[in-house]
Swiss-Prot record:
Cellular localization per UniProt: Cytoplasm
Classification of source organism: Bacteria, Pseudomonadati, Pseudomonadota, Gammaproteobacteria, Lysobacterales
Protein name in the entry: UDP-N-acetylglucosamine 1-carboxyvinyltransferase
Active site: C122
Main location group: cytoplasm
One Pfam family matching this protein: EPSP_synthase
Biological processes per GO annotation: cell division; cell wall organization; peptidoglycan biosynthetic process; regulation of cell shape; UDP-N-acetylgalactosamine biosynthetic process
Positions with a binding annotation for phosphoenolpyruvate: K22, N23
Gene: murA
Pathway, per record: Cell wall biogenesis; peptidoglycan biosynthesis
The enzyme's E.C. designation: 2.5.1.7
InterPro entries according to UniProt: Enolpyruvate_Tfrase_dom (IPR001986), Enolpyruvate_Tfrase_sf (IPR036968), MurA_subfamily (IPR050068), RNA3'P_cycl/enolpyr_Trfase_a/b (IPR013792), UDP_GlcNAc_COvinyl_MurA (IPR005750)
Molecular function, one GO term: UDP-N-acetylglucosamine 1-carboxyvinyltransferase activity
C-alpha cells in the first residue's frame, strides 16, 4: 500500500496553483443528470472522489468525456445525460463516497424514481441523511428505506413547497435544491447551508436554465422550470486546499502565494492565520502569506457552518497549534469522532488533551518524525503538515484518504521546497 514520507525542517517558499473544489465539483457533476443536453464542467480536479462520481454517472448510463487539458486551462468533462437508462446507485460505488447520495434529488426530479444505497465515506460521525429525505418528502416524494437503499418515487412532477431544515446540512441543501429546480411551482428553503460550494452549484444550475435566488444566504427561493438545457460551468477553487497550503507556510516559517484562489471564501481561516502572526496580502484571485523567521502563535477556534470556521480546516490548525507558542483550544461542533488524528499527532510528540468535543493543544518546541496512519481526509493532511516541521522522517500510511480530496499534494509541496515523496 502506498505511503507518503515527509522529511521535516524546510521552510516553504514559492507559488502554488489551487485546484477546483472537491465539495463543489461532486454535486455539480450530479446536477448534470437534471439536464436534457450535454453539460461541460471545467476546472475539475484529479481526485479519487471525482473518479468515483464519473463511474456512478456512467453506471446510470450517462456518457462522460474527459479532456485532461493543461496546467493553465485545467481538466474538463463533458457529461451527456441523454443516455441515462438506470436510476439505481449501487452499494459498490456509494459505499466509498458519501457524496453519492447527491444523485437522489436529480434522478427523482428528472425521472420520477431513484434508488440510492445508504452512503459510506470518511468515518467521522453519523452524518444522517434524514435532512435529504425530509426535504424531498416536502416536495411530494414518496420515500422508504429498504434493504440498505433509499427508494424514492414521485407521482408526476415534484411540487414546490416551503421547507425548513432541522439543522444546517450542506449536502441536504444541495440535494433538495437540485430537486426543486424541476419541481412545479415555487420552493423556499429555510435554514439552508450558506457554503460557497452551495452557491457554486446554484450558479451552475442557473447557467443551465434554473431560476434560483438567495444561494449563499439561509433562504433560497427556487422557481421551478420544466427543463434544464446544456451549458458550461467552471468549478470554483478549493478553499480547503487553499487553507491547507497557507497553514503549511505558516507552520514552517515560510512565504507562499496561492494562485487561482478565492480569498472571500476564507475570511474565518485568514483571520485565524493573522491571529497566529502571519502577514497576509490578497488580490482578487491570490493570497500571499508571509511568516518568515517567526514561530506561529497558538489560536483557539470553534468550528461552525459557513461563514464561521470550517470543520474541514480543524485538523490542519490543530497541527499548527502543536508547534505554536502558547495554548490553543479547539471546539468541534459539526462532526463527532473528528479528533481521530489526535492519537497520531501524539506519536509525533504533540501535547494534546481531549475532553469531549474540545481539544486543548499546548505548543511543543519540536516534534519528532514517526510512522503514523491517516484516519480520514483532513486528518491525513494534518499529519503531512506536522511532518513538515518534525525532526527526521514521518511516514504516513493509508494515504488513499488523501487522494480523495487533494490533487497532487506531494508534487505541489515539493515545488515549494518540502522534502516529500510517495512510496509504493
Amino acid at each position: 500500500m502506498a505511503k507518503i514520507v515527509v522529511t521535516g525542517g524546510q521552510a516553504l517558499h514559492g507559488e502554488v496553483h489551487i485546484s477546483g473544489a472537491k465539495n463543489a465539483v461532486l454535486p455539480i457533476l450530479c446536477a448534470t443528470l437534471l439536464a436534457d443536453a450535454p453539460v461541460e464542467i471545467s476546472n475539475v480536479p484529479h481526485l479519487h472522489d471525482v473518479i468515483t462520481t464519473v463511474k456512478l454517472l456512467s453506471e446510470l448510463g450517462a456518457e462522460v468525456t474527459i479532456d485532461e487539458g493543461t496546467l493553465a486551462k485545467g481538466r474538463s468533462m463533458l457529461v451527456d445525460p441523454r443516455s441515462v437508462t438506470h436510476q439505481v446507485a449501487p452499494y459498490e460505488l456509494v459505499k466509498t463516497m458519501r457524496a453519492s447520495i447527491l444523485v437522489l434529488g436529480p434522478l427523482l426530479a428528472r425521472y420520477g424514481t431513484a434508488e440510492v444505497s445508504l452512503p459510506g465515506g470518511c468515518a467521522i460521525g453519523s452524518r444522517p441523511v434524514d435532512q435529504h429525505i425530509k426535504g424531498l418528502q416536502a416536495l411530494g416524494a414518496d420515500i422508504s428505506v429498504e434493504n440498505g437503499y433509499i427508494k424514492a418515487t414521485s407521482n408526476g412532477r415534484l411540487k414546490g413547497a416551503r421547507y425548513v431544515f432541522d439543522m444546517v446540512s450542506v449536502t441536504g441543501t444541495e440535494n433538495v435544491l437540485m430537486a426543486a429546480v424541476l419541481a412545479e411551482g415555487t420552493t423556499v428553503l429555510e435554514n439552508a447551508a450558506m457554503e460557497p460550494e452551495v452557491t457554486d452549484l446554484a450558479d451552475c444550475l442557473i447557467a443551465l436554465g434554473a431560476r434560483i435566488e438567495g444561494a449563499g444566504t439561509p433562504r433560497i427561493v427556487v422557481q421551478g422550470v420544466e427543463r434544464l438545457g446544456g451549458g458550461h460551468h467552471a468549478v470554483l477553487p478549493d478553499r480547503i486546499e487553499t487553507g491547507t497550503f497557507l497553514v503549511a507556510a505558516a507552520m514552517t516559517g515560510g512565504s507562499v502565494t496561492v494562485r487561482r484562489a478565492r480569498p472571500e471564501t476564507l475570511d474565518a481561516v485568514l483571520d485565524k492565520l493573522t491571529e497566529a502572526g502571519a502577514t497576509i496580502t490578497t488580490t482578487a484571485d491570490s493570497i500571499t502569506l508571509d511568516m518568515q523567521g517567526k514561530r506561529p502563535r497558538a489560536v483557539s477556534l470553534t468550528t461552525a457552518p459557513y461563514p464561521a470556521f470550517p470543520t474541514d480546516m480543524q485538523a490542519q490548525f490543530m497541527a499548527l497549534n502543536c508547534v505554536a507558542d502558547g495554548v490553543g483550544v479547539i471546539n468541534e461542533t459539526i462532526f463527532e469522532n473528528r479528533f481521530m488524528h489526535v492519537n497520531e499527532l501524539l506519536r509525533l510528540g504533540a501535547d494534546i488533551q481531549v475532553e469531549g468535543h474540545t481539544a486543548i493543544v499546548r505548543g511543543a518546541e519540536r516534534l519528532s518524525g514517526a510512522p503514523v496512519m491517516a484516519t480520514d481526509l483532513r486528518a491525513s493532511a494534518s499529519l503531512i503538515l506536522a511532518g513538515l516541521v518534525a525532526d527526521g522522517d514521518t511516514t504516513i500510511d493509508r494515504i488513499y484518504h488523501l487522494d480523495r480530496g487533494y490533487e497532487n499534494i506531494e508534487e505541489k509541496l515539493g515545488a515549494l521546497g518540502a522534502t516529500i515523496q510517495r512510496t509504493a
